[in-house]
From Swiss-Prot:
Organism from which the protein derives: Humulus lupulus (European hop)
A Gene Ontology term for the protein's cellular component: mitochondrion
Stretch forming the transit peptide: 1-75
Tagged with keyword Repeat: yes
InterPro entries, per the entry: HOTDOG_ACOT, HotDog_dom_sf
UniProt lineage: Eukaryota, Viridiplantae, Streptophyta, Embryophyta, Tracheophyta
Designated name of the protein: Acyl-coenzyme A thioesterase 4, mitochondrial
Positions of the HotDog ACOT-type domain: 172-294, 370-487
Physiological role: Acyl-CoA thioesterases are a group of enzymes that catalyze the hydrolysis of acyl-CoAs to the free fatty acid and coenzyme A (CoASH), providing the potential to regulate intracellular levels of acyl-CoAs, free fatty acids and CoASH. Active on acyl CoAs with short chains (propanoyl-CoA and butanoyl-CoA), branched short chains (2-methylpropanoyl-CoA, 2-methylbutanoyl-CoA and 3-methylbutanoyl-CoA) and medium chains (octanoyl-CoA).
Presence of keyword Metal-binding: no
EC number: 3.1.2.-
Amino acid sequence: MMTPIGIRIRKQIPLSYHYSSIQALLSRFTPTPYNPISNSSSSTQTIPTQFHESQCTNPISRPTVFLFDPPPIRFTHTKSFSTDPSSLDFPSNQPPVVSTISSHHNISQPIDAGSSIRKPISLWPGMFNSPVTNALWEARSNMFEKYGEPTADPPSQSELVTKSPAQSRTSILYNLSSDYALREHYRNPWNMIRIGKLLEDLDALAGTIAFKHCTNEDGMSRPLLLVTASVDKMVLKKPISIDTDLSIVGAVTWVGRSSMEIQLQVLQTTHESSDPSDSVSLVANFTFVARDSKTGKSAVINQISPETGEEKLLWREADERNKMRKMKRKIQKDLELEKQYIERLNALLAEGRVFCDLPALADRNSILMKDTCLENSFICQPQQRNIYGRIFGGFLMRRAVELAFSTTYSFAGVVTHFLEVDHVDFLRPVDVGDFLRLKSCVLYTELQNPTEPLINVEVVAHVTRPELRSSEVSNKFYFTFSVGPEAVKDGLLVRNVVPATEEEARRVLERMDAETPHPHSQYENEI
C-alpha cells in the first residue's frame, strides 16, 4: 500500500505566474502514476501529490480524473485512487471534474501528472483545454493503460461484439454552483455560459463514448482511429445558467458498418419545474467514423443492440437521420439542374445585382453578404492537439462559434445570443503546424418574426499551405443567432442579407434546403 504524501496548499496561484518559477517547480516534481478507481472501496486510498510551501509559494492545481460506478456522487477536492494494479476496471460512467486553478473557495487541490513520464508545463491538462475535456482524455488514456501496449503487428478486430447503449453511457457533472474556479472557466463577459467551451466538451465526451463502444477487452485488437465526421443540428431549448449545476449524458444510439451516432443531452435542473424533460437544455447528435490506425482504411466496429423502448426509438430516429444524410448527398447535384432551382437562384441574385449596378438605389435595409464577413488566421499549436496528435475537433468548434458570434455582434450592433448549431462537417483532419484560416459571413437572415429575427452564419475553415500555394477546406460550420426582445423593442432593425454572386446564392440555397426535410429515399448504402 502506498502512503499519502504532501501537505495542504494554502496559497492561490497568481495569474502572473512566471515560467522560470514553473521550471523550478518542475525540477522538484516527480509525477506519480495512478490507476482508475476500483469497485471495491477497501482497495483504494488517497494519494494527493502536493508541494511544501517551502518549495514553491505558488502551487498549481489541475483537474484529476476520478472514475467510479453509478449512481453519480458529487466530488470533493481530494478523492481516492486505486493503487492495486489488479483492480483496474473499465472506466466508469461519470468522471467528475474539478477546477484547474485554486481559488479562495478551494483550500487545496491534488496535483497529478497522469503519467510516469514527466510532461512539460505546456502539456499539463487544464492549461489549454477545459477541465472536462482533460478529464475525458485522461479517462481514455486509462483505457489504453489497462490493456497495455499492443504487439508489434496486432491482428485486426475480427471478432466483433454486440453491445447495448447502456454499456457506452457516460455522464459528466459540472459543480458550477459550488466551484468558483470551474465557473470562471465557462463564464463569458455577459455572465452567461460560454457555448464554445460547451461544444468543446461535447466533442470530447462523444469521442470517449465512441471509444468505449469500440473497445474490446481482448487486449489484442488494433486501436482504432475514431474521428468526428459531422454534427447534426443542436438547438438550445432554454438558456443555460452559469451558477447552477450542469450535467452532460450521452450514449451510442446507432451503429452502421464503420460509423456510429452518439446522442448527448445537456441537463440543468431548475427549481421552477420537477418534470425531468424540462431539464434538457440541449440535444446533440455526433457522427463518428472508425479508421484502422495502421492502414487508414475504414474499420468495422462493434454493433449495437437496443434493449429498452427508449433505446429502440432513438435507434430508429438515428437510422432515419442516417438515410436522410445519404439521400441529400445523392440528390444535391440533381436539384441544381431543376428549373425551379434556377428560378430561386435568379430571385436571390436580383437584389444583389441592384447593389452592384445601381448602388444609390439599393434597399437601405439590405446589405451584401460580402460586407458581413470576418476572418481569423492562426497557426495550430501542439497544445491544441487531441490524444491522436491532431488538432482537437472541439477546439475548432469553439473557435468557429466564437468567430460566428463576433460576426453577428458586428452585424447587428448588439450582443446576440446563440440559438443552435445547424450543422458541422469535418471534411479533412487538421494537423499541428497547419496555417488555419476561419472565414465567416452572415448567409441570410429570417425576418418573418419581427420579435425574434434570426441570423444564420457560415464559418468555413481553410488549411492553407503557402509553400505549396494550396488551400483546402477542412471544416464547415453553420450557426443561428438572434437578438434579444429588448433590442427589438428599442427599435433595432436587423438588415436583410443578399448575395452578389452565383456562388454566394448557391451557398444560401444549399443551407436553406438543408433545413427543409425531403421525402424518404431507398438509398441505404453504409458509410
